[in-house]
């Protein structure tokens, strides 16, 4: 009989740019170690491992051309370095207060599990679980769309005083706007 607890479990985070320091990676690692009792591998994908605790496995970002939250789309590469089995992705600002074992044990046969945003009709991308290598079309379709259909627009958000990158699909009417990775991942999964 197959025991799901024997399957490879990976917890992956991504650190890019300067928004979150290495300390966020170190804290997330500590919370995962305290709250995940299943055997697992913790990996941080990053372009700069400075300050990340030496016990944390770091691997380089593969697609440095992906910007802002779209950096997450490289999680769907096949292969994603040597990572195999289930991947639980966690944003660096995630706070873990209780056991996260069930994030791996709930519906182990499911190829993708994500949390639905309560205020929008798409999946949240701060926490989701999927099988490594099973969804390369998420990034492949993104690459095709960016090259052939999208225009970029930088929008200033007065509330955060940040400039955000948005992509407009010029082939849809009205033009669809992808404000971040969450909307694109949801669209790609729904289209399949």
Q: Where are the regions a protein language model picked out?
A:
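Glycosyltransferase catalytic domains, chiefly GT-A lineage
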Residues: 2-192
């Amino acid at each position: 009989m197959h025991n799901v607890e024997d399957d490879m479990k990976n917890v992956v985070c991504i650190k890019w740019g300067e928004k979150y320091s290495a300390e966020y990676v170190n804290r997330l690692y500590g919370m995962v170690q305290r709250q995940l009792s299943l055997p697992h591998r913790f990996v941080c994908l990053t372009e700069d491992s400075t300050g990340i605790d030496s016990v944390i496995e770091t691997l380089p970002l593969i697609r440095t051309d992906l910007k802002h939250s779209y950096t997450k789309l490289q999680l769907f590469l096949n292969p994603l370095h040597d990572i195999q089995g289930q991947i639980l992705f966690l944003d660096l600002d995630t706070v873990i207060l209780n056991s996260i074992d069930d994030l791996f044990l709930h519906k182990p046969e499911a190829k993708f599990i994500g949390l639905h945003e309560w205020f929008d009709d798409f999946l949240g991308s701060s926490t989701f679980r999927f099988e490594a290598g099973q969804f390369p079309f998420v990034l492949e379709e993104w690459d095709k769309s960016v090259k052939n259909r999208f225009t970029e627009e930088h929008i200033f958000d007065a509330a955060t005083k940040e400039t955000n990158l948005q992509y407009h699909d010029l082939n849809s009417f009205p033009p669809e706007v992808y404000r971040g990775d969450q909307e694109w991942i949801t669209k790609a999964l729904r289209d399949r």
